[in-house]
Amino acid sequence: MTDHDERTFVMVKPDGVQRGLIGDIVTRLETKGLKMVGGKFMRIDEELAHEHYAEHEDKPFFDGLVSFITSGPVFAMVWEGADATRQVRQLMGATDAQDAAPGTIRGDYGNDLGHNLIHGSDHEDEGANEREIALFFDDDELVDWDRDASAWVYEDLADHD
Ligand code: DAT
Ligand code: MG
C-alpha cells in the first residue's frame, strides 16, 4: 500500500502575500490532489528566521534572506499526500524563478532568485519536512481529516472494480 500521508512544510513568502498570490498557490497544491492539514498566517521573527534558514547561515546571502523573510507576513502551511515533499518541490520549480520552468509556481509568477514566492521543504534533505513542520506548528495545530477526493486522486484508494 502506498504511503499517502507524507507531510511537508510549505510557505507563501512575503512577496507572494504582497502580490495577492496566496489563493493561486493554494489552488495549485489543492488541484494537484494534495491535502492541507495546517495553515497559519503569521509574521516570522528574527529568531525563527535564523532557525528556519540555519543551513544557509554561512552563505553571503544569509542576511538578505533573513531580512526578506521577516519583511512582511507569510502563509505557513502543512500539506499531505503521497511523495508530498518531492511533489511540492516539482510544483514550485527551480530556486531561481528566472530559470524555473513555465507551468511551475516560480516559473509562472516569479522573476527573481530571492523573491521566489514559495518555500517548500527540501526532499533531498532527509527529515527536513518533519523538522520544519515542528518548527512552525504544534501537533494540535495540525488536522487529521479524510479528503473524499483522495479516492479519485490515488487509484489504490478507489473502491471501484
Ligand atoms: P529553495 O528555496 O529552492 O529550497 P535554497 O534552500 O537553496 O532554495 O535557498 C533558500 C532561499 O535562499 C532561496 O529560496 C532563495 C535564496 N537564495 C538561494 N541561493 C541564493 C543565492 N545564491 N543568492 C541569493 N539568494 C539565494
Ligand atoms: Mg531550501
UniProtKB/Swiss-Prot annotation:
ATP binds at K13, F61, R89, T95, R106, N116. The active site is at H119 (pros-phosphohistidine intermediate). Its cofactor is Mg(2+). CDD domains: NDPk_I. One of its GO terms (biological process) is UTP biosynthetic process. It is found in: Cytoplasm. Pfam families: NDK. The keyword Magnesium applies. Keywords: ATP-binding, Cytoplasm, Kinase, Magnesium, Metal-binding, Nucleotide metabolism, Nucleotide-binding, Phosphoprotein, Transferase. InterPro entries: NDK-like_dom, NDK-like_dom_sf, Nucleoside_diP_kinase. Its EC number is 2.7.4.6. GO terms for molecular function: ATP binding; metal ion binding; nucleoside diphosphate kinase activity. Its main location: cytoplasm. It is an enzyme of class 2 (transferase). GO terms for cellular component: cytoplasm. It catalyses: a 2'-deoxyribonucleoside 5'-diphosphate + ATP = a 2'-deoxyribonucleoside 5'-triphosphate + ADP; a ribonucleoside 5'-diphosphate + ATP = a ribonucleoside 5'-triphosphate + ADP. It comes from the Archaea. Major role in the synthesis of nucleoside triphosphates other than ATP. The ATP gamma phosphate is transferred to the NDP beta phosphate via a ping-pong mechanism, using a phosphorylated active-site intermediate. Belongs to the NDK family. This is Nucleoside diphosphate kinase. It comes from Halobacterium salinarum (strain ATCC 700922 / JCM 11081 / NRC-1).
